[in-house]
Amino acid sequence: MFGGHSFDVGYVMRHPVFLVTFIIAIPSWIIAFAGQCAAEAKYSSSNGRTPVAGTLWFNIWLQLMLTVSLAISSDDLALHRFQLSIFLAIATALAVGGVEFIFQTPGAYIAIGVGWLLLTMVNLVWIVYLTSEEDTFLYNVLNSGGNGGLSSHNRRIGTSVQRRDETPGYGGGEMGLGNSMGGMPRGISSNTINSGGYGGGYAPASMEGTPQKVTSVTRNEYGHTGVQSPGIDESVPRPQRAKALYAYSASPDDPNEVSFMKGEILEVVDATGKWFQVRTPAGVTGIAPSNYLVLL
């Protein structure tokens, strides 16, 4: 979940459900924690063997861990949502015991009950959101106004991604796709031209280095050139493909990203790093988070 990323509240700020629940959860945790401290200081047994809060002390730290984990969650939240849901269910079950303090007379007890009542409601919203599958009614309701749901906000701190316009390179008398293309065949080389022909393969296109198939051209001994009929070159490896595990919405802040639906098959141009360079079925080339894809 943390993935080496620095702290960024962008995901929370961009999602209405998370924003509202965090506004409620943080003060509620403080109220519950302060109430437990006050109750222990004033009403616990003199020998300290009979605490007032009991198991709520375990739950208060579990709740803090879950709140912080969701607050610093990145674009791979979807991969950890089931684990988070399990711990949230445990925290909710324990929190119900803390709600009973709301019926007591001392002010510290009432504070404990109010704090845990609000935290219980927040936990239930989080559980419903994290466990709802896409295209369901509850998911669409809780995700209204967000940027792509569990994949809404993306971060790539520490990730080096080569742009498409930087892909074509020149060196050693050869023009072709750079090493970042992940094993794709070279394009047109000066050695091939001098020897009297162009080898069939992938060559850089005129627009943003998109690989395109070129027709094999031969030259006979009299200098005449002839075009062979295009066919499948068995020596050229087929491009790698990947299946989308989750739907992803491209960030409006990065024009290099591409959007795709769950289950779509994408053509992988570069499979190195945390961000793959892919081509969608619509022919759009850009980058996509690798943890949302599985190579076929």
Curated annotation (Swiss-Prot):
Pfam families: SH3_1. CDD domains: SH3_Sho1p (cd11855). Residues 237-296 form the SH3 domain. InterPro entries: SH3-like_dom_sf, SH3_domain, Sho1_SH3. SUPFAM superfamilies: SH3-domain (SSF50044). The keyword Coiled coil does not apply. PROSITE patterns: SH3. Residues 36-51, 103-109 are extracellular. Belongs to the SHO1 family. This is High osmolarity signaling protein SHO1. It comes from Cryptococcus gattii serotype B (strain WM276 / ATCC MYA-4071) (Filobasidiella gattii).
